[in-house]
């Protein structure tokens, strides 16, 4: 567990034809908002660059998609392993930092892809090897498993020409089977009380529903906004303002 996120970190440590830190050349041309994130269904990488720096951004992205492994070393893996483990410790030590472990482990059965957190366990992070790095890159980072988005000061014809120039020689990766754990149903209502060293109490109620590619996803996100996504939402009005039994309410669909 946690390898997709660990690999995300390795993607910023240089590639075969751009071996330096990934961020440095972007900073030099005035790029902003450059980062990457990993969540349950995807890893994404993004940056906002001046129009004149588009070729640089496409070169950097294509080089780490097609030519990363020659720049990855055991030292880099060990370094980023430590960074991720510190990130995990910081998150775990935050107020309610262990909540999502309980949610995922109890709401989704063992074997379901959402049963574990994206940051992973310390044991799995410790065991990640260079062989794991090579296999993950080869299996998952082909162009047939990626979506490339260019938005802003560019037309379709220019976008296709630039993308073909920089990405056209990257070979297709292996076919990746779709992982579908289905929507689990608990055999009975489940309640759990967790203690934390915080002078407040939180109540969470969770339900499972279909994924992002299913029609109900947008409906659920909209419903969550109506219920608790805004300061004027229905649960805020009822529980915070009218009955004054809560200091805050939120609702969201993941």
Feature map (PLM): residue ranges:
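Non-catalytic, conformational "gating/processing" segments within enzyme and secreted inhibitor domains
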Residues: 74, 81, 130-166, 203
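M16/insulysin-pitrilysin zinc metalloprotease superfamily fold
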Residues: 13-16, 48-79, 229-231, 253-254
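Active-site SXXK
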Residues: 2-15
């Amino acid at each position: 567990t946690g390898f997709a996120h660990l690999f995300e970190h390795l993607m910023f440590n240089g590639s075969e034809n751009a071996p330096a830190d990934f961020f440095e050349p972007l900073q030099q041309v005035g790029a902003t908002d450059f980062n990457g994130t990993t969540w349950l269904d995807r890893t994404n990488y993004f940056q906002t660059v001046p129009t004149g720096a588009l070729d640089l951004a496409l070169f950097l992205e294509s080089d780490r998609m097609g030519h990363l492994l020659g720049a990855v070393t055991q030292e880099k893996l060990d370094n980023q392993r430590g960074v991720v483990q510190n990130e995990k410790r910081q998150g775990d030590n935050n107020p309610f930092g262990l909540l999502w472990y309980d949610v995922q482990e109890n709401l989704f059965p063992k074997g379901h892809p959402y049963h574990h957190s994206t940051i992973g366990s310390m044991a799995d992070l410790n065991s990640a090897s260079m062989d794991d790095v090579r296999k993950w890159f080869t299996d998952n980072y082909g162009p047939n498993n990626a979506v490339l988005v260019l938005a802003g000061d560019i037309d379709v014809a220019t976008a296709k020409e630039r993308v073909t120039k920089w990405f056209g020689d990257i070979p297709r990766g292996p076919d990746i089977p779709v992982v579908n754990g289905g929507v689990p149903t608990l055999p009975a209502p489940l309640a759990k009380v967790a203690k934390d060293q915080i002078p407040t109490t939180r109540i969470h109620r969770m339900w499972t529903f279909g994924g992002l590619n299913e029609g109900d996803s947008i409906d659920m996100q909209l419903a969550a906004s109506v219920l608790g996504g805004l300061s004027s939402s229905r649960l805020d009005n009822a529980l915070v303002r009218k009955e004054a039994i809560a200091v805050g309410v939120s609702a969201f669909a993941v």
